[in-house]
């Protein structure tokens, strides 16, 4: 349409498997019957609430992936003559990941249920689920990079991708 343009995929540090672009509106004429009014704004907010459930779900998946990657690394890497998995601080870090995963999952399920009941869901519960899940994902992605050591920042490492994607997830879709 006249006055609407779109960019090619943005060169982002994260979510590289899901290209994002921009829409630009310049001097676009909107017919009076097509303008976003109160009912349309409500629908738009329901869309944002759905995006928050989506972000919370991603956060849960990222935490679970961090747990999986760290368990494999801890069982296969040795330090001080023993597997990392025998070192109490590593056990504690992975245990905290598992605890936050369960909390994030249950909060996300409650938020999803509220959305499924209609009327756009409980916006406070949806925001809590998004905030907790994405913050926990970031926190545990940082821990995963630490557990991996130098390999954690190498491009071939899965945890470096979790780190990049978790940061973006905190920013997307607001709170």
Q: Model regions: which residues?
A:
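Glycine-rich phosphate/cofactor-binding loops in nucleotide/flavin-utilizing enzymes
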Residues: 148-175
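Hydrophobic alpha-helical segments of membrane proteins
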Residues: 136-144
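C-terminal helix-coil-helix/basic helical segment that borders enzyme active sites and/or dimer interfaces
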Residues: 71-85, 98-132, 145-153
């Amino acid at each position: 349409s006249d006055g609407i343009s779109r960019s090619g995929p943005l060169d982002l540090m994260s979510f590289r498997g899901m290209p994002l672009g921009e829409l630009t509106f310049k001097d676009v004429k909107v017919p009076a019957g097509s303008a976003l009014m109160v009912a349309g704004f409500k629908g738009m907010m329901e869309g944002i609430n759905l995006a928050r459930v989506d972000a919370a779900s991603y956060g849960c998946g990222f935490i679970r992936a961090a747990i999986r990657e760290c368990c494999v690394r801890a069982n296969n890497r040795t330090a001080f003559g023993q597997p990392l998995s025998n070192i109490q601080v590593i056990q504690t870090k992975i245990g905290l990941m598992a605890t936050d995963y369960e909390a994030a999952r249950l909060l996300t399920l409650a938020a999803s249920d509220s959305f499924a009941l209609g009327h756009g869901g409980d916006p406070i519960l949806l925001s809590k689920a998004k905030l907790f899940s994405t913050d926990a994902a970031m926190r545990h992605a940082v821990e995963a990079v630490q557990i991996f050591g130098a390999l954690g920042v190498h491009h071939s490492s899965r945890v470096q991708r979790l780190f990049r994607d978790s940061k973006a997830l905190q920013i997307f879709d607001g709170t």
